[in-house]
Each structure stands twice: as C-alpha cells, then as structure tokens.
Design a protein with these regions (language model features):
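Charge-rich amphipathic alpha-helical interaction elements
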Residues: 1-221
C-alpha cells in the first residue's frame, strides 16, 4: 500500500491517527448497515417468492374460470356484465425509510360503501364461473400490490447494498491500510530524526567536555 504524500511531523501523525480512528468507526457502522440491509433484503426475497407463487396461481385460476365463463356465455352478455363495475378504488402511494432507503408503500382506498361488493352484474344471465373469476381477481389484488411493493423495495435495497459494499471495501482495503502505512512511516521517520538529534547532541556534549578539559589544564599536564 502506497504511503500518503504528507509531511512526517508530529502534528500530521496526530491528524492521521484521528482520521484512522474515524475510518475504523465508519467501517464498523457501514458493515453493520450492510449486514442489516442484507437481512431485510433476504426477508423480502423470501416473502416475494411466496407471494409470486400465490399471485400467479390466483391469476391462473381466474383465467381458467374466465375461459369457462366465456364458453358458457355469449360475448355480448359477458361484455355487458363487465361494463359497469360497482366497486371503485384509488391507490395511494407513499414511502417509508428503511436504513436510509426510501421504499414504496401502496394503500388501496375503496370508494364504495362495501368493499366486498365486487359484482357489477346480476346473476340471472351470468355463470358461476364468471363469479369465481371476479372473486379470484379481487382476492389477489392486495397480494399483487404487496408484490409490487416488495419487488421495487428489493431493487432499491439491492442498489443500496452494493453502494454500501463498495464503501466498506474502500475503507477496508484502501483507506485504512493507507492510513496505517503512513502512520507507520511517519513514526519511523520521527524515531530516526530523534535518534539523529540525540547522536548530534551527544557529539556536541563530547566536544564541549573535551574543550572544558583543555581549559582546565592549559599546559596539558
């Protein structure tokens, strides 16, 4: 790891030690965040798998019932039956914060008095299979909305996990080792300078003692 281009001074050493301490704390916090994001992501993936199976099965069953109803009814009767739905709804979209990631939240608001009133037709000229198809689609609507929430949330969490992973790796493999190597280098340089200064002082001391000895004995006796 390359040493940073800094002056090997005690002030710089203190500054780098402070930065290293901050980097280590940041590294731990980011690792904890990454691990928690992964845990939540995997929980959502598990829920997504179960929901998708349920939704696909519900749509499949609704399609089967609709085909049976279409074969039992003429096209005009089927079109009239489905023309004017009695149930109205609106979709409210909001967001919630999960580990600094804003994920979507969908909420259905029913505008009719009875949200279970899903049939827009009378039963005199329709088949039971049409009732079953409409009922199946109505039942899976909440699951479809939740599935949309989860899939978008997984996409957003995956992006944040990757971004956090890159930051963790940058700290772990680049910044922290570089700080450590630079601190080691500066400490070594300061030790060398201190030893060099001590050696020079010892030489000066010896010279001064030798000169003092000559002054005390000017005749060399």
């Amino acid at each position: 790891m390359a040493v940073m281009n800094v002056n090997p001074t005690r002030m710089e050493l203190t500054n780098l030690k402070r930065k290293l301490s901050t980097a280590r704390r940041g590294h731990k916090l980011l690792k904890d965040k990454r691990d928690e994001l992964m845990r939540r992501f995997l929980d959502l993936v598990k829920e997504n798998k179960a929901l998708r199976i349920r939704v696909e099965e519900g749509i499949k069953q609704a399609n089967v019932n609709m085909e049976i109803a279409r074969s039992a009814m003429n096209d005009k009767s089927l079109s009239v039956a489905m023309m004017l739905p009695t149930q109205e709804m609106s979709l409210d979209s909001s967001e919630k914060n999960v580990m600094s990631v804003m994920i979507p939240v969908f909420d259905v608001q029913y505008k009719t008095a009875d949200k279970n009133d899903i049939y827009s037709y009378g039963t005199a000229f329709t088949s039971a299979e049409l009732d079953n198809a409409v009922s199946a689609l109505s039942e899976i609507m909440p699951d479809m909305l939740r599935l949309a929430e989860i899939e978008k949330s997984c996409q957003l969490l995956a992006g944040e996990i990757e971004k956090t992973r890159r930051r963790v790796n940058a700290l772990e493999h680049v910044m922290i080792p570089q700080y450590e190597e630079t601190i080691k280098y500066i400490s070594m340089k300061l030790d060398e300078n201190e030893r060099s200064t001590t050696t020079r002082l010892m030489k000066v001391k010896d010279m001064m003692l030798e000169q003092a000895h000559h002054y005390d004995d000017p005749f060399g006796m």
